Swiss-Prot record:
This is N-succinylarginine dihydrolase. The lineage of its organism: Bacteria, Pseudomonadati, Pseudomonadota, Gammaproteobacteria, Oceanospirillales. PANTHER family: N-SUCCINYLARGININE DIHYDROLASE. Pfam families: AstB (PF04996). SUPFAM superfamilies: Pentein. Its EC number is 3.5.3.23. It catalyses: N(2)-succinyl-L-arginine + 2 H2O + 2 H(+) = N(2)-succinyl-L-ornithine + 2 NH4(+) + CO2.
Length: 447
């Protein structure tokens, strides 16, 4: 029975305060580019261009709005007082790193927004959402409350959508969302198996990274599977290789990407590669198609530098697949040759590679896959969405014009204390919620 299920990629709009603050420990690109001058307008338009090109290629594309930044409420909670200008000036003088954190536009990476289970797999026949607590870093810990509000506004109809509490924001339940989750299936309109990848086990775990933190726990992944009603026949929990995390693979989507029955991964993606593949094969009703990239072909360092595995793997109507890679892959001769010989030339469904320029995002450590949250939706569920959140040409043009009106083309670290930036951002976001038709979702609209 066909339900016309389509996977929709909901990309995050880059916010007006996009900057390079070097906030993310363990994210090599973010740390390397901290302090550079950013171009928020270019970043947002690059993201929109990627969305539009995929929409024009026939893929279903959605939009998620950015967060309210600077988060002056967070600064006030931390003891800074006075009017907005005074709070900004105090923070810039006394704690510049905190100011940079509350201005972060990191919500653009919607792969970390939530973990999603489609209605095909859920016992109650609804789409299930759990916004990620992102407790590993302060600048991202600020996101979940607004994220949950945005998701509840867009996916509002309780007949079709279920929203679960964010997990407790403690190291035990550290959760970074869909960046550590892949659904494997024969096709998007068939039941799937959920691969949850964790970096460490809070209770009783022995193996973990030594250099950089593991941001996802087994306990968090298990809790989300329970919330969504998934049993052992639909779930596989696999540990990410600690050496990969120490090489800068801070999420599993930096070292592996799955779509349909295909799992494209680096040989260092999982601590126990054989057991992971066997567990998937035992649960899947369709044969798994593993596409393994050995270290001899691409080193961990090149995988992190080019974000090959942070590509989007998308299904075409004829059963073939398109791989959407960042421009950095084409610039690296070794990686580009491997794409041609091993991926396009191999015995797998990958038949096309599209190269996208997302440099403004890449400098903060986010490739094409970081920028999107995958949600498989039946026709009735797409019709139940609130507002204008599925991209068409008119919405793209409206959003591009909105960016041109409101975004700066230059934002240096010293600009973050400018009180005008607050006013500009709130004006832009207020207009955006009207443009998208999702109602009041931001703190300044609710207070």
């Amino acid at each position: 029975m066909s339900q016309d299920v389509r996977e929709v990629n909901f990309d995050g709009l880059v916010g007006p305060t996009h900057n390079y603050a070097g906030l993310a420990h363990g994210n090599v690109a973010s740390m390397r580019h901290g302090g550079l001058t950013a171009n928020p307008r270019e970043a947002a338009l690059q993201g929109l261009a990627k969305m539009k090109s995929l929409m024009e290629a026939g893929f279903a594309q959605g939009v998620l709005p950015p967060q309210q930044r600077p988060d002056l409420g967070a600064l006030r909670d931390l003891g800074f007082t006075g009017d907005d200008a005074g709070v900004l000036a105090q923070a810039a003088r006394q704690a510049p790193q905190l100011l940079r954190a509350v201005c972060s536009a990191s919500s653009m990476w919607t792969a970390n927004a939530a973990t999603v289970t489609p209605s095909l797999d859920a016992p109650d026949g609804r789409v299930h959402f759990t916004a990620a607590n992102l407790q590993s870093s302060f600048h991202r810990y600020l996101e979940p409350r607004t994220t949950a509000r945005v998701l509840a506004a867009m996916f509002h109809d309780p007949a079709h959508f279920a929203h679960h509490p964010v997990l407790p924001a403690t190291p035990t339940f550290s959760d970074e969302g869909a960046a550590n989750h892949t659904r494997l299936c024969g096709d998007h309109d068939e039941p799937g198996v959920h691969l949850y990848v964790y970096g460490r086990q809070a209770f009783g775990g022995e193996h973990g990274p030594k250099r950089y933190p593991a941001r996802q726990t087994l306990e968090a992944s298990q809790a989300i599977a329970r919330q969504h009603g998934l049993d052992d026949t639909r779930t596989v929990f696999a540990q990410q290789h600690p050496d990969a995390i120490d090489a800068g693979v801070f999420h599993n989507d930096v070292i592996a990407v799955g779509n349909g029955p295909v799992l494209l991964y680096h040989e260092m993606a999982f601590r126990d590669e054989t057991a992971t593949l066997e567990a998937l094969r035992a649960r899947m009703s369709t044969p798994l198609i593993p596409v393994r990239v050995p270290s001899e072909a691409i080193s961990l360092e090149d995988a992190v530098a080019t974000y090959l595995f942070n590509s989007q793997l998308l299904s075409n109507p004829d059963g073939s697949m398109t791989l959407v890679v960042p421009g950095e892959c084409q610039e690296n001769e070794t990686v580009w040759r491997t794409i041609q010989d091993l991926l396009l030339g191999g015995n797998n469904p990958i038949s096309e590679v599209l190269v996208k320029d997302v440099k403004q995002s890449m400098r903060n450590g986010g490739g094409p896959a970081c920028l999107r949250l995958r949600v498989a939706l039946a026709a009735r569920e797409r019709q139940a969405l609130t507002g204008r959140v599925l991209l068409d040409e008119a919405l793209h043009d409206d959003l591009a014009a909105w960016v041109e009106r409101h975004y700066r083309d230059r934002l240096a670290p010293e600009d973050l204390a400018d009180p005008l930036l607050v006013r500009e951002s709130l004006t832009a976001l207020d207009e955006l919620t009207q443009l998208l038709g999702i109602g009041a979702v931001y703190p300044f609209q609710l207070n």
